[in-house]
């Protein structure tokens, strides 16, 4: 019963992937193995493939020979699609050999036709035909290599640095692997000419790079060498550019100038284009603020607030600066002196050096004198308290506009 149940017929549709043969319908049994099915196909299939060359694929799976069909095929399908792939034992011939074979056959047929037409031919005429055939083939080879040689010349002209590495490989017999024929694209004279052109081009580029580097190295050294030369000519005096530098440092700057990102002064349109409506808005805000202070405080507080606002306004306008340094007051006087006589700067520097030397001698005179001077320079308690209070309250007031433009 089991064997009769196992021998159930099943229909397989064998498809060839190369579409060389049409789909073949094969009847077999479920108890067959894949190897037995291959043996059956080697007898039934039109191409008669060998068993070892067959590959059966079912549902994207390669079927091994030991499996049975009942374990592979789906029972709900009536027809089962199996793809047959056969390995090729004879490799395809190259088209180059076929063309050579055709050319040889054409030569043989032409020689036979010429011999039949002339009746009897001498060996010399046969040699002439062979020489003509060889000449035609050599002309074909020459025509075939001519475009390649032209492209090689163009490439070598565009990229001359490639020629240096390929010079040794172009000559026959040098750096050529054994067993390979060498067909040089250029003659030795052409190769020497290309090498000379490459050397000339390389020399010109090298000279340009060296000259550019020399000029870049000379330019930054000129300012550094000019100063020692001036010092050598005038050893006892300061160099002439010193008064100019002092004049530039003591030159009065334009105050209250704002700079924009492009480097020019900022033109504040609000200062120039303020119409009557803007002024009315400003006065109304000030009136509202003063009315609130007047009605919700006493008269004395109102006077204090008015005085504080007036003080802040004068400080913002620059009429009443709280933190004015002495350097800004002395700058116009120094600038006038420098403009009148350039030697005054040197005299001031000499006087400053003499004063420092005198101070150093006074400091070395005795320890008691130094202690007395330090005691005299120490501020008192009241002066410290007054400076602390004034500094604290003046720091609460906002600073005015910048005095020096950036």
Curated annotation (Swiss-Prot):
GO cellular component: membrane
Annotated compartments: Membrane
Keyword Transmembrane (UniProt): yes
Function: Could be involved in the unfolded protein response (UPR) pathway.
GO annotation terms (biological process): endoplasmic reticulum unfolded protein response; spermatogenesis
Residue ranges with Polar residues bias: 127-154
Taxonomic superkingdom: Eukaryota
Segments for region (Disordered): 86-154
Primary site of residence: membrane
UniProt KW Membrane keyword: yes
UniProt name for this protein: Homocysteine-responsive endoplasmic reticulum-resident ubiquitin-like domain member 2 protein
Membrane topology label: Single-pass membrane protein
InterPro entries: HERPUD1/2, Ubiquitin-like_dom, Ubiquitin-like_domsf
Taxonomic path: Eukaryota, Metazoa, Chordata, Craniata, Vertebrata
């Amino acid at each position: 019963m089991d064997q009769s149940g196992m021998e159930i017929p099943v229909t397989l549709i064998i498809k060839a992937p190369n579409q060389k043969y049409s789909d073949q319908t094969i009847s077999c049994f479920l108890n067959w193995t894949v190897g037995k099915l291959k043996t059956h196909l080697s007898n039934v299939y039109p191409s008669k493939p060998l068993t070892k060359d067959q590959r059966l694929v079912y549902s994207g799976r390669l079927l091994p020979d030991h499996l049975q069909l009942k374990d592979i095929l789906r029972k709900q399908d009536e027809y089962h699609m199996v793809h047959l792939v056969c390995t090729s034992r004879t490799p395809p011939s190259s088209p180059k050999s076929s063309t050579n074979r055709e050319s040889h056959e054409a030569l043989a047929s032409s020689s036979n036709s010429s011999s039949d037409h002339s009746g009897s031919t001498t060996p010399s005429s046969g040699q002439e035909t062979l020489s003509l055939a060889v000449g035609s083939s050599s002309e074909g080879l020459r025509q075939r290599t001519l475009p390649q040689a032209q492209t090689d010349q163009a490439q070598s002209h565009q990229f001359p640095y490639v020629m240096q590495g390929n010079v040794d490989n172009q000559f026959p017999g040098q750096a050529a692997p054994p067993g390979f024929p060498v067909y040089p694209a250029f003659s030795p004279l052409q190769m020497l000419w290309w090498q000379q052109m490459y050397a000339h081009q390389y020399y010109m580029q090298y000279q340009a790079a060296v000259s550019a580097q020399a000029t870049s190295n000379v330019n930054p050294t000129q300012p550094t060498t000019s100063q020692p030369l001036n010092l050598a000519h005038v050893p006892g005096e300061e160099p002439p550019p010193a008064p100019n530098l002092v004049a530039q440092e003591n030159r009065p700057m334009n105050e209250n100038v704002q700079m924009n990102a492009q480097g020019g002064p900022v033109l504040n349109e609000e200062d120039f284009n303020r119409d009557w409506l803007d002024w009315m808005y400003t006065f109304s805000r000030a009136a509202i603020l003063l009315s609130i202070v007047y009605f919700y405080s006493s008269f004395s507080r109102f006077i204090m607030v008015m005085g504080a606002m007036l003080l802040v306004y004068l400080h913002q306008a620059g009429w009443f600066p709280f933190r004015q340094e002495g350097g800004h007051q002395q700058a116009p006087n120094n600038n006038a002196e420098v403009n009148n006589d350039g030697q005054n700067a040197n005299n001031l520097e000499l006087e400053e050096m003499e004063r420092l030397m005198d101070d150093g001698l006074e400091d070395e005179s005795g320890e008691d004198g130094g202690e007395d001077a330090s005691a005299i320079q120490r501020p008192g308690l009241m002066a410290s308290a007054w400076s602390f209070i004034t500094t604290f309250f003046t720091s609460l007031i906002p600073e005015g506009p910048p005095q020096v433009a950036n």
